[in-house]
Protein backbone atom coordinates (compact mmCIF):
# COMPACT_ATOMS: atom_id res chain seq x y z
CA UNK A 1 0.00 0.00 0.00
CA UNK A 2 1.12 3.57 -0.61
CA UNK A 3 1.88 5.63 2.47
CA UNK A 4 0.00 8.83 3.30
CA UNK A 5 2.21 11.92 3.16
CA UNK A 6 2.16 14.15 6.24
CA UNK A 7 3.59 17.53 7.16
CA UNK A 8 4.51 18.75 10.63
CA UNK A 9 4.22 22.43 11.50
CA UNK A 10 6.44 23.25 14.46
CA UNK A 11 10.07 22.19 14.57
CA UNK A 12 10.37 22.21 18.37
CA UNK A 13 10.45 19.31 20.83
CA UNK A 14 7.05 17.81 19.96
CA UNK A 15 7.35 18.26 16.21
CA UNK A 16 10.86 16.81 16.06
CA UNK A 17 9.96 13.81 18.21
CA UNK A 18 6.92 13.15 16.00
CA UNK A 19 9.02 13.38 12.83
CA UNK A 20 11.44 10.76 14.13
CA UNK A 21 8.54 8.46 15.06
CA UNK A 22 7.00 8.76 11.59
CA UNK A 23 10.34 8.06 9.90
CA UNK A 24 11.29 5.12 12.12
CA UNK A 25 8.07 3.46 13.13
CA UNK A 26 5.15 4.16 10.81
CA UNK A 27 3.93 1.63 8.25
CA UNK A 28 1.25 4.01 7.00
CA UNK A 29 2.74 7.53 7.06
CA UNK A 30 5.53 9.22 5.13
CA UNK A 31 7.16 12.55 5.95
CA UNK A 32 6.30 15.15 3.32
CA UNK A 33 7.57 18.28 5.06
CA UNK A 34 8.88 19.77 8.30
CA UNK A 35 7.79 23.37 8.79
CA UNK A 36 9.25 25.94 11.17
CA UNK A 37 9.85 29.66 11.54
CA UNK A 38 13.41 29.58 12.90
CA UNK A 39 15.97 28.69 10.20
CA UNK A 40 18.45 27.79 12.94
CA UNK A 41 16.15 25.34 14.78
CA UNK A 42 17.50 21.90 15.57
CA UNK A 43 14.32 20.29 14.26
CA UNK A 44 14.73 21.76 10.77
CA UNK A 45 18.42 20.84 10.74
CA UNK A 46 17.60 17.23 11.65
CA UNK A 47 14.87 17.08 9.03
CA UNK A 48 17.25 18.32 6.35
CA UNK A 49 19.83 15.69 7.34
CA UNK A 50 17.11 13.04 7.04
CA UNK A 51 16.16 14.27 3.55
CA UNK A 52 12.78 15.62 4.64
CA UNK A 53 11.66 18.72 2.68
CA UNK A 54 11.85 21.76 4.97
CA UNK A 55 10.78 25.37 5.10
CA UNK A 56 11.46 28.07 7.71
CA UNK A 57 8.67 30.28 6.37
CA UNK A 58 5.77 28.81 8.32
CA UNK A 59 2.48 27.78 6.78
CA UNK A 60 3.00 29.96 3.69
CA UNK A 61 6.30 28.20 3.09
CA UNK A 62 4.51 24.86 3.38
CA UNK A 63 1.92 25.89 0.79
CA UNK A 64 4.76 26.95 -1.52
CA UNK A 65 6.57 23.60 -1.42
CA UNK A 66 6.57 21.67 -4.72
CA UNK A 67 5.06 18.58 -3.06
CA UNK A 68 2.33 20.44 -1.11
CA UNK A 69 -0.51 18.90 -3.14
CA UNK A 70 0.70 15.39 -2.19
CA UNK A 71 0.40 16.10 1.55
CA UNK A 72 -2.89 14.85 3.01
CA UNK A 73 -2.48 15.21 6.78
CA UNK A 74 -0.90 18.14 8.64
CA UNK A 75 0.16 17.86 12.27
CA UNK A 76 0.26 21.20 14.08
CA UNK A 77 2.78 21.28 16.94
CA UNK A 78 2.98 25.06 17.33
CA UNK A 79 0.80 26.91 19.86
CA UNK A 80 -2.92 27.29 20.40
CA UNK A 81 -2.97 30.79 18.92
CA UNK A 82 -0.88 29.81 15.89
CA UNK A 83 -3.06 26.78 15.21
CA UNK A 84 -6.14 28.94 14.72
CA UNK A 85 -4.35 30.82 11.93
CA UNK A 86 -2.79 27.67 10.44
CA UNK A 87 -6.13 25.88 10.33
CA UNK A 88 -7.84 28.85 8.70
CA UNK A 89 -5.20 28.78 5.96
CA UNK A 90 -5.03 25.01 5.37
CA UNK A 91 -8.58 23.75 5.91
CA UNK A 92 -9.93 25.41 2.72
CA UNK A 93 -7.15 23.63 0.82
CA UNK A 94 -8.49 20.24 1.91
CA UNK A 95 -5.79 19.28 4.41
CA UNK A 96 -6.75 17.09 7.39
CA UNK A 97 -5.48 18.72 10.59
CA UNK A 98 -4.26 16.89 13.68
CA UNK A 99 -3.92 19.53 16.37
CA UNK A 100 -1.27 18.87 19.01
CA UNK A 101 -1.90 22.26 20.65
CA UNK A 102 -4.68 23.06 23.16
CA UNK A 103 -6.56 25.16 20.57
CA UNK A 104 -9.39 22.58 20.42
CA UNK A 105 -11.02 23.73 17.19
CA UNK A 106 -12.02 20.14 16.42
CA UNK A 107 -13.29 17.34 18.68
CA UNK A 108 -11.09 15.93 21.44
CA UNK A 109 -9.51 12.57 20.65
CA UNK A 110 -7.79 10.17 23.07
CA UNK A 111 -6.94 6.99 21.11
CA UNK A 112 -7.60 4.47 23.89
CA UNK A 113 -11.03 5.99 24.57
CA UNK A 114 -12.58 7.34 21.35
CA UNK A 115 -10.13 6.74 18.50
CA UNK A 116 -12.73 5.76 15.92
CA UNK A 117 -15.39 8.38 16.69
CA UNK A 118 -13.89 11.28 14.73
CA UNK A 119 -11.85 9.76 11.89
CA UNK A 120 -13.86 11.77 9.34
CA UNK A 121 -13.46 15.11 11.14
CA UNK A 122 -11.41 17.67 9.18
CA UNK A 123 -9.66 18.74 12.39
CA UNK A 124 -9.10 16.68 15.55
CA UNK A 125 -7.56 17.87 18.79
CA UNK A 126 -5.19 15.67 20.79
CA UNK A 127 -5.98 17.52 24.06
CA UNK A 128 -2.64 17.80 25.93
CA UNK A 129 0.13 15.51 27.15
CA UNK A 130 -1.47 15.45 30.60
CA UNK A 131 -4.85 14.73 29.07
CA UNK A 132 -3.54 11.85 26.97
CA UNK A 133 -2.02 10.30 30.10
CA UNK A 134 -4.90 10.77 32.52
CA UNK A 135 -8.21 10.90 30.64
CA UNK A 136 -8.05 7.14 29.86
CA UNK A 137 -8.01 6.54 33.63
CA UNK A 138 -11.05 8.77 34.19
CA UNK A 139 -12.83 6.95 31.35
CA UNK A 140 -11.87 3.58 32.86
CA UNK A 141 -13.58 4.56 36.12
CA UNK A 142 -16.60 6.23 34.51
CA UNK A 143 -17.44 3.16 32.42
CA UNK A 144 -17.97 1.29 35.72
CA UNK A 145 -19.53 3.94 37.94
CA UNK A 146 -20.47 7.63 37.47
CA UNK A 147 -17.61 10.04 38.29
CA UNK A 148 -18.89 13.13 40.08
CA UNK A 149 -15.52 14.91 39.98
CA UNK A 150 -12.13 14.11 38.47
CA UNK A 151 -8.89 15.97 39.11
CA UNK A 152 -5.58 15.32 37.38
CA UNK A 153 -2.09 16.54 38.23
CA UNK A 154 0.54 16.24 35.50
CA UNK A 155 4.17 16.74 36.53
CA UNK A 156 6.67 17.04 33.69
CA UNK A 157 10.37 17.85 33.58
CA UNK A 158 10.88 21.56 33.01
CA UNK A 159 13.61 20.71 30.50
CA UNK A 160 11.08 18.93 28.29
CA UNK A 161 8.79 21.98 28.04
CA UNK A 162 9.74 24.22 25.14
CA UNK A 163 8.49 27.75 24.48
CA UNK A 164 5.27 26.50 22.84
CA UNK A 165 4.30 24.41 25.87
CA UNK A 166 5.08 27.30 28.21
CA UNK A 167 3.00 29.70 26.13
CA UNK A 168 0.08 27.28 26.35
CA UNK A 169 -0.05 26.74 30.13
CA UNK A 170 -3.43 28.46 30.61
CA UNK A 171 -4.91 26.70 27.59
CA UNK A 172 -3.48 23.40 28.90
CA UNK A 173 -5.53 23.58 32.09
CA UNK A 174 -8.71 24.75 30.32
CA UNK A 175 -8.57 22.21 27.48
CA UNK A 176 -7.63 19.28 29.72
CA UNK A 177 -10.39 20.15 32.21
CA UNK A 178 -12.97 20.24 29.41
CA UNK A 179 -11.77 16.94 27.92
CA UNK A 180 -11.93 15.22 31.32
CA UNK A 181 -15.68 15.82 31.06
CA UNK A 182 -16.18 15.42 27.29
CA UNK A 183 -14.03 12.30 26.80
CA UNK A 184 -13.41 11.00 30.31
CA UNK A 185 -17.07 11.11 31.27
CA UNK A 186 -16.73 12.96 34.59
CA UNK A 187 -19.45 15.42 35.65
CA UNK A 188 -16.78 17.99 36.46
CA UNK A 189 -13.04 18.09 35.79
CA UNK A 190 -9.97 19.99 36.91
CA UNK A 191 -6.40 19.88 35.58
CA UNK A 192 -3.15 21.05 37.14
CA UNK A 193 0.27 21.04 35.44
CA UNK A 194 3.62 21.25 37.19
CA UNK A 195 6.88 22.01 35.38
CA UNK A 196 9.38 20.32 37.68
CA UNK A 197 12.79 22.07 37.58
CA UNK A 198 14.64 19.23 39.36
CA UNK A 199 18.06 18.19 38.06
CA UNK A 200 18.58 15.59 36.82
CA UNK A 201 15.15 15.82 35.16
CA UNK A 202 12.47 13.51 36.56
CA UNK A 203 10.25 11.21 34.52
CA UNK A 204 6.68 12.32 33.75
CA UNK A 205 4.33 11.52 36.64
CA UNK A 206 0.56 11.84 36.66
CA UNK A 207 -1.99 11.54 39.46
CA UNK A 208 -5.71 11.03 38.89
CA UNK A 209 -8.38 11.48 41.58
CA UNK A 210 -11.99 10.44 40.93
CA UNK A 211 -14.85 10.93 43.39
CA UNK A 212 -17.49 8.21 43.04
CA UNK A 213 -20.60 6.91 44.79
CA UNK A 214 -19.52 3.28 45.15
CA UNK A 215 -19.96 1.74 48.61
CA UNK A 216 -19.97 -1.84 47.23
CA UNK A 217 -16.53 -3.56 47.46
CA UNK A 218 -17.42 -5.63 44.38
CA UNK A 219 -17.59 -2.40 42.37
CA UNK A 220 -14.14 -1.45 43.67
CA UNK A 221 -12.75 -4.62 42.11
CA UNK A 222 -14.51 -3.80 38.82
CA UNK A 223 -12.91 -0.35 38.87
CA UNK A 224 -9.44 -1.81 39.43
CA UNK A 225 -9.88 -4.29 36.59
CA UNK A 226 -11.17 -1.58 34.26
CA UNK A 227 -8.16 0.62 35.04
CA UNK A 228 -5.69 -2.22 34.48
CA UNK A 229 -7.28 -3.03 31.13
CA UNK A 230 -7.10 0.62 30.07
CA UNK A 231 -3.42 0.82 31.06
CA UNK A 232 -2.86 -2.09 28.68
CA UNK A 233 -4.76 -0.29 25.91
CA UNK A 234 -2.65 2.87 26.27
CA UNK A 235 0.66 1.04 26.63
CA UNK A 236 -0.04 -0.69 23.29
CA UNK A 237 0.92 2.60 21.61
CA UNK A 238 2.93 4.22 24.45
CA UNK A 239 5.13 1.37 25.78
CA UNK A 240 6.48 3.48 28.66
CA UNK A 241 3.00 4.07 30.14
CA UNK A 242 2.41 2.23 33.42
CA UNK A 243 0.90 2.29 36.90
CA UNK A 244 3.41 3.53 39.45
CA UNK A 245 1.63 1.73 42.30
CA UNK A 246 -1.62 -0.09 43.01
CA UNK A 247 -4.90 1.74 42.55
CA UNK A 248 -6.17 3.12 45.87
CA UNK A 249 -9.89 3.31 46.67
CA UNK A 250 -10.55 5.01 50.00
CA UNK A 251 -13.68 6.06 51.86
CA UNK A 252 -14.29 9.81 51.96
CA UNK A 253 -14.56 11.02 55.59
CA UNK A 254 -17.93 12.48 56.54
CA UNK A 255 -16.34 15.81 57.52
CA UNK A 256 -14.55 16.31 54.18
CA UNK A 257 -16.34 19.16 52.33
CA UNK A 258 -16.34 17.59 48.86
CA UNK A 259 -19.65 19.26 47.99
CA UNK A 260 -17.70 22.34 46.88
CA UNK A 261 -16.24 20.26 44.01
CA UNK A 262 -19.53 18.87 42.74
CA UNK A 263 -22.04 20.04 40.17
CA UNK A 264 -24.94 18.40 42.03
CA UNK A 265 -26.21 14.95 42.93
CA UNK A 266 -25.40 12.46 45.66
CA UNK A 267 -22.40 12.93 47.87
CA UNK A 268 -19.58 10.59 46.71
CA UNK A 269 -18.62 7.80 49.09
CA UNK A 270 -15.11 6.96 47.82
CA UNK A 271 -12.04 8.46 46.20
CA UNK A 272 -10.22 6.51 43.50
CA UNK A 273 -6.53 7.46 43.27
CA UNK A 274 -4.40 6.40 40.29
CA UNK A 275 -0.65 7.03 40.12
CA UNK A 276 1.04 6.83 36.72
CA UNK A 277 4.41 7.35 35.16
CA UNK A 278 5.23 7.76 31.49
CA UNK A 279 8.71 6.91 30.30
CA UNK A 280 9.60 8.30 26.89
CA UNK A 281 11.03 6.28 24.01
CA UNK A 282 13.94 8.78 23.83
CA UNK A 283 13.48 9.35 20.10
CA UNK A 284 14.44 13.01 20.55
CA UNK A 285 14.72 14.11 24.18
CA UNK A 286 15.83 11.55 26.82
CA UNK A 287 13.46 9.06 28.46
CA UNK A 288 12.33 11.54 31.15
CA UNK A 289 10.27 13.35 28.48
CA UNK A 290 7.32 10.96 28.53
CA UNK A 291 5.08 13.97 27.92
CA UNK A 292 6.48 14.23 24.40
CA UNK A 293 6.13 10.52 23.80
CA UNK A 294 2.50 10.20 24.83
CA UNK A 295 1.46 13.23 22.78
CA UNK A 296 3.30 12.29 19.60
CA UNK A 297 2.38 8.59 19.88
CA UNK A 298 -1.30 9.50 20.26
CA UNK A 299 -1.16 11.87 17.30
CA UNK A 300 0.55 9.29 15.11
CA UNK A 301 -1.95 6.63 16.20
CA UNK A 302 -4.85 8.75 14.94
CA UNK A 303 -3.09 9.63 11.68
CA UNK A 304 -2.46 5.94 11.05
CA UNK A 305 -6.12 5.12 11.75
CA UNK A 306 -7.11 7.78 9.19
CA UNK A 307 -4.65 6.30 6.67
CA UNK A 308 -5.95 2.77 7.31
CA UNK A 309 -9.55 3.91 6.87
CA UNK A 310 -8.61 5.57 3.58
CA UNK A 311 -6.94 2.38 2.36
CA UNK A 312 -9.96 0.27 3.37
CA UNK A 313 -12.38 2.45 1.40
CA UNK A 314 -10.37 2.37 -1.84
UniProtKB/Swiss-Prot annotation:
Q: Which organism is it from?
A: Rhodococcus erythropolis (strain PR4 / NBRC 100887)
In Swiss-Prot or TrEMBL terms, this protein is called Acetaldehyde dehydrogenase 2
- List its EC numbers: 1.2.1.10
- Asked whether the keyword NAD is assigned, the reply is yes
Q: Which reaction does it catalyse?
A: acetaldehyde + NAD(+) + CoA = acetyl-CoA + NADH + H(+)
Give GO terms for biological process: catabolic process
**Belongs to which family?**
Belongs to the acetaldehyde dehydrogenase family.
The catalytic site is made up of 129 (acyl-thioester intermediate)
Question: Which keywords does UniProt give here?
Answer: Aromatic hydrocarbons catabolism, NAD, Oxidoreductase
User: Domain of life, per the record?
Assistant: Bacteria
The top of its lineage is:
Bacteria, Bacillati, Actinomycetota, Actinomycetes, Mycobacteriales
Amino acid sequence: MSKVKVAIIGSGNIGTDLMIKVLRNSDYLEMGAMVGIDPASDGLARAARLNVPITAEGVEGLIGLPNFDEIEIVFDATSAKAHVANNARLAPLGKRMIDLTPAAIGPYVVPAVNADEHLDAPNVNMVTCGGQATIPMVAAVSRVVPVAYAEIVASIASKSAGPGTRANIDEFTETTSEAIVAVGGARRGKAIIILNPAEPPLIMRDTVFCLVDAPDPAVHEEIRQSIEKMVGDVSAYVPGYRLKQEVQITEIPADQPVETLLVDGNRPTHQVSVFLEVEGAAHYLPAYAGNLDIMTSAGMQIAERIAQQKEATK
